[in-house]
């Protein structure tokens, strides 16, 4: 079959198509289907949401989940599944969704969504993986490989810098290239290089004043030329601003169709010569290639939704994060009388609203999933769908709390608090929930909170409750996963894929999120833990954090090469031991810290992780690899990644704030950074460039001699007044032109030195 694809002559097929057929191939037939050309054997194919389960609509189509879709399995949304830090698990989830797509005649699944969690307020954060681009990219690549192993395509989205819902169809994300390359692009880049998704979905927004749908730099220069993407680019639904400009920029497919309006504009542009027909042909070829890649591999397999439901439960169990377990209040014992309080115990919130909303065939709640011999009483406590303090419900909950040994409060955000289409205005739980939690704590200190939310919430009761389980949105089997973790049937192993700040104002984007036609990303590369850890700020819970019912120790950190060059790959290994009494899984995290940074960089950055399962007393060696990119930052002068020579610390930890082992390496890089030397170039800049460092030393020496009246020694009083540190600081920021005033140089001499230095830079001595 693969050979048949390779022998298919797409260019010949395209040559037989009319201009109208080619233009039509570049837009959808309707909300979900691509057009067919029956006379040439081009089939009609369907695409469908979504990132955590199929939202296939047979009748009325829409992109916001307003109309019904077929019954399907809702897997845990990305906000939860990313907390698994488990590539194999995510690949398995992808395979399962891919099988369901094959069986339902869906050619492309519209996901995963890998936009970075810039702010907790983004209404669509439940659908996104992480604040960290490395984690998001690794998880996304695994998911994509899983789906596409079933010969069903994916459409990674939303490319790019789509990090809020407010005015998402028109606002401009204003970010410098380094920020885009280091934070908002890498998850997409990793997906291309490790999984080659069949399709990309461009975002609604503008990037620095140009719509993503017509941004040639984004869709062609970066995506295709830099990264090597081979598939087709489709628009988000209704994202096209100028169809002809979009086609020229690299937008192949408009979704949904525009009732022929934009097809006519394409044909007119070809006829009047403003659009080259080869550009149209190239787009058609990309689309046909993916259509046939699916059509030639039609292999529907039987699947049972019940089995996939159990897979959804397993993913949720592997991902939920135990945040607090004071006095080992968890796991619960069947012999204990436990009060479950809160509507989410009976009717869980397990997915978000909008295009990814699944019509579940089955939903499991925690109340019905507890062990058969468990002693559980239930009180609703507060309505789960609105912020309303009900005195009668509260009184019932308080009475249950008084007679119980322990209380588990199922708190969280109602559907109306977060959804696609709008952002939150605050990080608070509904007031009615916080009020009831406070009252219950007055009568029952043995209280555990289970959170159902798509994005972090403030926790005013954090120091008073004994346990917190972050369940996020758990998918349709999330209730069973919660019950199994609470009762110790499953040992929690998830870790936070995002930082939980103490309060909203602590977030780095706080002053620059939301309103206006332009959103300025002034925090630059300091997103999430990159900001909090660099600032050494107090957080509620740090990135990568999560507890287990067992304990782990780390030892024997080994690094294969402590003096690498930028061309080397380094192997890092560490032993992890389960020092507790039950089996468990630990997520080992590797961070890199630039100790001699020549530019402003975060305190540390995640560059590796592995999840390892260990029996009690068992030790395993975890191995990870680092390459040039692991140490590099994006240099806009080089237009490339640059790993500067110097010392780097390899940090092994259980979270970004819990570093267990570290070792320093020294990297050497022969890569030359372009440098234009002029009158305002500083001595510090010359010192920091290996090609001009020696010349800078000579200039500084002459400058200091002139300052000392031609002598290398200063008077005692001067020596006391001017320290070496002062001189170093002054010379570091001194422009070359200042040598006229302070160094006894003429303007002509300085220009001659500049010419000499530029020559040294251009032809460095080997």
Residue ranges and their predicted role:
Residues 1-632, 647-652, 656:
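Glycoside hydrolase catalytic-domain context in secreted enzymes
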Residues 10-13, 266, 496, 726, ...:
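Generic structural signal of hydrophobic/aromatic residues within well-ordered alpha-helices
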Residues 15, 19, 31, 271, ...:
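Generic surface-pattern signal
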Residues 528, 544, 548, 581-583, ...:
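In a subset of proteins, long, contiguous C-terminal domains/tails are tracked
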Residues 627-671:
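Terminal connector regions
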Residues 668-688:
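Low-complexity, Pro/Ser/Thr- and charge-rich linker/hinge segments at domain boundaries
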Residues 681-752:
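Conserved, compact domain cores that house catalytic/ligand-binding motifs in diverse enzymes
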